Amino acid sequence: MLIRGLDMADIFDEVSEELKQDKLIQTWKKYSKIIITLILLIIISLVSYQSYLIWKKNKIEEISEQYFEALEKLENKNYSKSQSLFLKNAQNHKNGYKMLSLFGLAESNYQNGKIDEMIMNYKAIYDDESIGIYYRDLSRILSVLKDNLSSFDQQKLLLQPILNSPSKLQILAAELEILLFIKFKKIKEAEKALNILLDRSDISFEQKNRLELINRIYKNNVF
């Protein structure tokens, strides 16, 4: 009886296993197309993503090469060529190289004597809120520093957002403001701004030396 019981148990196990297999086969037949489609979609997605990463890497390398080629032309004083390359990079890309290319484009135009174009290049940087505030402030300072066309009010207005904020470049902007006063022969304003800046405890040793030198020069000649 024990043997028969074991045989019956084995038979039930076999039948149960066969039923499971039949059910699995039926399920596979019913859903195989959907399952295969899902697997293919996953594979296609993975391949597409990897292809995108490879494309992106190659694109970044291409952009990088274009930027450094433009930079080399700028360093070699081939300003027309550097202007063309920087302009292409600035127009076609939206990553960090666009911002760097705008700085390079501004410098190329400045060296070519195209001050109006230079001003617009820097404006494109400081008007773009997606760019970090440090670089936007830096573009304002460089624009004022190199601008020999705009009025005093226009240049002073450009510096004002830096002067009124806790920017890392605030002290440098304050120093540039003094030079702006002197440039436009606003001597009393220059002297007042110079004394205020010299009294600040957060100016660097190098900047203090520069300011004291300016103070001595203009005190002996103008102030």
Model region roles, listed by residue range:
Residues L2-I43:
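N-terminal positive-inside, membrane-proximal cytosolic segments immediately preceding the first
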Residues A9-S16, E72, K98, D127-D128:
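Acidic, proline/glycine-rich low-complexity intrinsically disordered segments
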